[in-house]
């Protein structure tokens, strides 16, 4: 599967304006991340790890990762002593979706506490997401949506609408998370493949 994705990426780099190739790439990336990189991570320093019930140490000896990106960040948290405490999917934040107007629950990817070089202790809530799913906002805070497909087939329109809905849902989640963090003394951040250092 990794070989297939690399070949599609190679074709896409030669044809960056091809909507069809881009959609195929996103499809295979979603399959690859969901079906081939889920698993259980066993932290080498479980005393730093907290699970959804607040248990630490020996009671938190396995953690589920849902993408290779999450696995890479788990290894980072586990390795460095500057990360004092961390956990995956330990915080639930209620939010109102822009798509259906209903209340849902957002389970954040990571919680961690770190000691910065200055000695300051900072608490973070972190989301790991592809850059393509990260909404860009204008100066008024409105989402900048991707251009609609030039080929107006129903399939292309559905794919475009789905991508727009993903941006709207993520914006709803992250706005709620930012409010929660301001109220509780946390910092909210979103990491993409660029920050994690993953290349396709």
Question: Model segments located where?
Answer:
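Electrostatic, structured charged patches in enzyme active sites and in nucleic-acid/phosphate-binding
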Residues: 4, 8, 16-17, 21-200
């Amino acid at each position: 599967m990794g070989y297939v994705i690399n070949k599609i990426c190679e074709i896409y780099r030669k044809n960056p304006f091809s909507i069809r190739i881009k959609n195929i790439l996103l499809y295979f990336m979603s399959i690859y991340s969901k079906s081939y990189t889920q698993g259980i991570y066993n932290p080498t320093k479980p005393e730093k790890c907290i699970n959804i019930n607040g248990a630490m140490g020996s009671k938190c000896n396995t953690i589920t990762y849902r993408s290779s990106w999450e696995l890479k960040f788990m290894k980072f948290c586990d390795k460095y002593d500057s990360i004092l405490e961390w956990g995956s999917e330990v915080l639930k934040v209620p939010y109102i979706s822009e798509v259906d107007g209903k209340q849902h629950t957002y389970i954040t990817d990571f919680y961690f506490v770190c000691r910065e070089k200055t000695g300051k202790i900072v608490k973070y809530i972190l989301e790991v997401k592809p850059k393509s799913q990260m909404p860009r906002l204008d100066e008024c805070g409105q989402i900048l949506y991707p251009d609609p497909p030039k080929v107006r087939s129903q399939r292309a329109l559905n794919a475009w609408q789905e991508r727009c809905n993903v941006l709207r849902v993520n914006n709803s989640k992250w706005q709620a998370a930012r409010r929660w963090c301001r109220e509780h003394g946390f910092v909210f951040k979103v990491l993409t493949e660029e920050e994690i250092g993953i290349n396709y």
